[in-house]
Amino acid sequence: MCVAILTPDPNEKFQTMFDAGQAAAFMQLAAWELGVGSCPASLYEFDKARAILGFPVEWHLRIALSFGYALEEEKLSAPPKKGGRMLLEEVVHWEKWG
C-alpha cells in the first residue's frame, strides 16, 4: 500500500512540510504498532506524480509512504545491527561548537 501526503504550496508556507513530515512519522509509528513496516520516499518528478495520481494543481506531493509486511517476521523484532556510525561524542556539541 502507498500513501501520498499532499500539502498546499510549500513555497508559500514552509510549515506545511513540517506538518507533512509529522503526519508521515505518526502513520509510520501507528503502522509499526500493527506489525506493518514502512518506507518514506521523497518525490522529485512532480509533474509525473500529478499525471499518475490526478491530484489538483493547487496541491503538492512531497512525501509518499509505502507500507507492507516484512518477508520474514523475525526481522521486525530483530535487534538493530551495529553499524559504522560515528560515536555520539563525534557528532554532538554541548553548549557551544567544538
Language model: regions and residue ranges:
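Acidic, surface-exposed loops and disordered segments
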Residues: 1-98
